[in-house]
């Protein structure tokens, strides 16, 4: 960890400061685990290319990486299409309408997706949140970050960055304060078959 010195870092929600962003990116590049705001609830994140950090998040969640059905967030649609294989035109149009937004799309994983993140069915959850802090972190880092939920059901604990630091500060390296988060997770849509199926109804209203 980076010690408690850099633990809670405030980033402006509409004008993220480059200096803070580069501190977050340094943390991610050194294999750190962060808590960060999205367009829904706060997430646990790390670089998708740091296997130790992914394993650490799975340990916090008490899940086996193979069974965890992990997701990550991309900067934009061209980034997303690197990590998903076979997105046809009609699905692409839907993604274009729905994103950035509070959805997680389950798609067939391309070979660019690190093995540890692929489910047994070779799928991956992909997300482009409508949150400038999260998107700026990925753009500065240059590749996606994991998007994992905190364990447990006490949703209030995961909306307030200061409470997150109090509860989880010993297990994660940095908490990003981007203001109070939402309490409803993203809507999860399985797009691996012809009939798109809502697996979890969340903040995103599906009318496509």
Give the predicted meaning of each segment.
Residues 6-208:
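Active-site-adjacent structural elements in enzyme catalytic cores
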């Amino acid at each position: 960890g980076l010690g408690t010195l850099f633990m809670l870092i405030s980033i402006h929600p509409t004008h993220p400061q480059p200096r803070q962003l580069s501190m977050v990116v340094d943390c991610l590049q050194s294999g750190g685990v962060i808590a960060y705001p999205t367009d829904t609830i706060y997430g646990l994140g790390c670089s998708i290319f740091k296997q130790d950090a992914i394993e650490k998040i799975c340990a916090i969640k008490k899940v086996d990486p193979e069974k965890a059905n992990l997701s990550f967030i991309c900067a934009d649609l061209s980034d997303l299409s690197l990590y998903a294989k076979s997105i046809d035109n009609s699905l692409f149009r839907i993604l274009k309408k729905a994103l950035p937004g509070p959805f997680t799309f389950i798609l067939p994983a391309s070979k660019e997706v690190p093995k540890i993140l692929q489910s047994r069915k070779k799928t991956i959850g992909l997300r482009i949140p409508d949150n400038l802090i999260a998107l700026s972190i990925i753009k500065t880092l240059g590749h996606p970050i994991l998007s994992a939920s905190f364990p447990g059901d006490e949703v209030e604990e995961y909306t307030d960055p200061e409470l997150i630091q109090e509860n989880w500060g010993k297990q994660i390296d940095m908490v990003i304060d981007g203001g109070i988060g939402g309490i409803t997770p993203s809507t999860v849509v399985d797009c691996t078959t012809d009939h798109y199926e809502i697996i979890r109804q969340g903040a995103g209203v599906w009318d496509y």
